Amino acid sequence: MTQLTENTDELHSIRLAIDPNLITLPIGSKSTSPHSNSTSDGNPESHNTENEEVDNKAGSLPPEQFSNNSAKLIVNPYEKYGRMSLGQLIPLISQQRGPNFKFADINEDILKQELAIENDNGKQESKDDTKAEDGIDTMDIDQNDNSEANTNDIGYNEWSNEPKEDTGILDNTQDTNINGEMESQLTQEEFNKIRKVMLEHINMAMNESSLAMEFVSLLLSPVRESTAVSSMSPFLKKTVNPGSLNSEKVKMPAVSRRDKLSLSILSRGWKLRALNEARAILKKNFTEISSSLKQEHHYWSSIAYNISNKDVLFKIRDKQTTKRSLGLKYGYEDSGSTFRNDRGTAILRGTDEANGLELIPLTLGRTSTVGSVYKGGKFLRVRIFTKIESEGDYILSGESSLDKLFKNHSENSDSKNDDVRLQISKLKFFIFEQELMHQLKKECAYLISYGVTVENEHKIVIELPNEKFEIEYLSLDDDSVVNHEQDAPKANDRRANLMLVTLRMLLIVIYKKNLRQKMVSNTRKHIASTEKDILLIRPLLGKMRHSNHKKLIRKILKECVLEVVPDTELQERSIQSLDKEDFETFDLQDAHIVKLTKDINAFRNVLDVGKTEFTIDMKQSGKLSLILESPNYCNAQVSIKYDNQTSNTHFNTVSTEFKEVEEFLHFLISTYVNPE
């Protein structure tokens, strides 16, 4: 809205809205003024009669005809585009859109999108102009009347905003198939109608841009008159005097000193609050980082102090704390163990205590603690029972003692305070005892016929003619274990301890055999045999049974030969009968294989099957020899050979029954040696 003031009479000024569409002239008029009742000098008689006649004719015409036959207030040089043919207008539009534009890509949807975007931008600009013009005097013009006049004269719609540059909606990359379908649906009449509407909007946009330029020129005329007049249209120069439109700067209300002080205090308060919050956050983070750094230092120092080069560490995620941690491998898998019920892995978790480390075995689950490892730990115990022949019952004559590692163990002891090395040693002991019991039960499946039975999951019984051995898998908290420390020593305690130590050493021999087999598997074919590979109870049982068999042979020889044939003497010697596959020496350059073989050969006397030769020199009657051996550690086989005085062999037989041996010796002595 603007205010036009005439220089001749400021009191009786005429207020007009600079809208050229409201002021029209007949097409054939020669006058430059569209009004017949107002002039620049305020004298109505200065108008000629020709203009009055034209005005009367224009007032008598209908609105539609008057609108079509009228001339715009601003002489727009671009109005000639409306009279161009389609062949001339389309190249101009293509040139305005850009080099990549194709007129065939235009459709109704794209034009609607452009109009909607321009309408939104126009509304935003109008709001900004309204805010900028606060404080400036405006003319009292009826907005509703003007909007109705604009709508009736120029067909106003949402395209009334100023045209903007190409928004890029008509890009060549649009789908040509959709455009082709839209064009195929338009008829010639619809196309002409759309073209007419488009031209009207183009003309309206150019008129509005010209009007905006006129307004800016008139507003600039008080400051730079020469520059403003050069851009004014001839009609505006004649109708409105330059410098008649002005603008003023509205000053903001001054801020008082009190308000400034209040704002300064408020600003400082917010800054102090932000600084205090930042200080608290930094202090909290510093405390947390310092505590974490201290724990990490303590954790790694404990690992460096307690973990040796022989221990195997690996990365693992703790499922309970969901943090990365270190895992310790305390099992014997790398040493040749084939036990898979417990892989022997634990988590090294840091603590705030003195030792700084805590071992959590993975097999115990999330809720288990280190204390439950030792309280629920189990070990092997060997007990020896001697048979009382008069009563037909057994009496305890020997019991293995608890390992020195647990001598000071009690129910109230706190295992968390143990040294890490001690914890690792205990865990290794428990998993070793567990595997030993597992292997013993597997071996017992093949020794049922020799008096070896599994009474329950934690007890194995070995029965001999005069003795009985019990191998138990007990918990450290068992009452019998606690009370055993107070019992008096028994006769066979040392024997029970030696038997338990031998079982553990034989399990180590199995480990070494497995390692050696892995190393030589590429050059030597091996067929795994469960019955043959597990040698724990059989070597011990074979030694004890062989000893009983020797006593029986001595008794038979004494009754059948020594007491019958005079001047006879019994000689006895042991013969080594080694299994070549077990005690083979490999001619290899690998030092590890050679060392393993030497370690295995150190247990020859234990693993060797029993073989004893009995020789009786009967002088005048010849020589009698018996060889007692145990092919599979448990069975007995007796070879009898008799040579006469000329060293001719008369008999060479083998028997597996001692009754047959006794009968054969009685026959031999009574027939060949002492026929009388």
UniProtKB/Swiss-Prot annotation:
Q: Which family does it belong to?
A: Belongs to the Mediator complex subunit 17 family.
GO BP: cellular response to heat; positive regulation of transcription elongation by RNA polymerase II; positive regulation of transcription initiation by RNA polymerase II
According to its UniProt record, where is this protein located?
Nucleus
Stretches the record annotates as Disordered: 27-68, 117-176
Self-association state and partner proteins as the record states: Component of the Mediator complex.
Query: What GO terms are given for molecular function?
Result: DNA-binding transcription factor binding; RNA polymerase II complex recruiting activity; RNA polymerase II core promoter sequence-specific DNA binding; transcription coregulator activity
Q: What is its main location?
A: nucleus
Which gene carries the instructions for this protein?
SRB4
Q: Which UniProt keywords apply?
A: Activator, Nucleus, Transcription, Transcription regulation
Domain of life (superkingdom): Eukaryota
Residues crossing the lipid bilayer are: none
Q: How is this protein named in the record?
A: Mediator of RNA polymerase II transcription subunit 17
Keyword flag Nucleus: yes
Biased segments, Polar residues type: 146-160
What is the recorded function of this protein according to its Swiss-Prot or TrEMBL entry?
Component of the Mediator complex, a coactivator involved in the regulated transcription of nearly all RNA polymerase II-dependent genes. Mediator functions as a bridge to convey information from gene-specific regulatory proteins to the basal RNA polymerase II transcription machinery. Mediator is recruited to promoters by direct interactions with regulatory proteins and serves as a scaffold for the assembly of a functional preinitiation complex with RNA polymerase II and the general transcription factors.
Compositional bias (Acidic residues) = 135-145
- Record's compositionally biased regions (Basic and acidic residues): 47-56, 120-134
Please report the organism this UniProt entry assigns to the protein: Candida glabrata (strain ATCC 2001 / BCRC 20586 / JCM 3761 / NBRC 0622 / NRRL Y-65 / CBS 138) (Yeast)
